[in-house]
Design a protein with these regions (language model features):
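Hydrophobic membrane-insertion alpha-helices, especially the h-region
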Residues: 4-22
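Aromatic-capped interface at the extracytoplasmic side
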Residues: 16-35
Length: 218
């Protein structure tokens, strides 16, 4: 009896893993643009993400993998969706911040570099501000209104890296077409975490149900 249950469980795990490998693509995260979310512990190596290529619905805060010309795919966070109005503004209390549709947004996932002599800029988005109102506006004037604010075109998204001090994202490339998006990050495996433990947790925690549901997001 116990043997039959164990055998059935092994078959179930095998089927789940086959399904997982079919709908996701394994990507190794390279670089520091998404710290502290990924590659925060440089001594251990690079983190790995699993991208659901069937999930075509993108929400604020989703982490996505984007195909860009003449280089490897990049990993960024969705900041604004089609029709959204984006700006980078100066707030007296918090420094430079993102403004979406007239509202300042809180980004607790950002990498904050501590710099006592320049804490206002480091805590805010000074680098993003410079790129947004400088090279981006110069290279992609079609994205901007006369007010200086950016409007995300239909069928495109505005995405940024969490480490704004070291990220080539929409402030560099402009908005990304949705056809460039390889998929949404479904799961992550931290550097040093064994594959067996990762897959075991994926199955036993029932996370594969979320993967199945996300496959039907069109």
């Amino acid at each position: 009896m116990v043997g039959n249950v164990f055998f059935t469980y092994c078959i179930l795990i095998a089927l789940v893993l086959v399904f997982f490998s079919t709908v996701t693509v394994e990507c190794v995260v390279v670089g520091a643009s998404m710290r502290p979310k990924y590659n925060n512990d440089t001594k251990k190596g690079n983190d790995t993400v699993y991208v659901n290529t069937l999930n075509k619905v993108y929400n604020y805060g989703d982490i996505i993998v984007i195909n860009v010309q003449d280089r490897d795919p990049i990993i960024k966070r969705v900041i604004a969706l089609p029709g959204d109005v984006v700006d980078v503004v100066f707030d007296e209390n918090d420094g430079y911040k993102l403004e979406i549709n007239g509202k300042l947004i809180e980004e607790d996932y950002l990498l904050i570099k501590h710099d006592e002599e320049n804490i206002l800029n480091q805590k805010g988005l000074y680098t993003t501000f410079v790129h947004f109102h400088g090279s981006l506006k110069e290279n992609h004037p079609e994205l901007f209104m006369r007010s200086g604010k950016l409007v995300v075109p239909n069928g495109e998204i505005f995405a940024l890296g969490d480490n704004r001090h070291d990220s080539k994202d929409s402030t560099y490339y402009g908005t990304f077409k949705m056809s460039q998006i390889a998929g949404v990050v479904e799961l992550e495996r931290k550097a040093g975490e064994g594959e067996f433990k990762f897959y075991w947790n994926y199955v036993t925690n029932g996370k594969f149900f979320s993967t199945i549901a996300n496959c039907f997001n069109k």
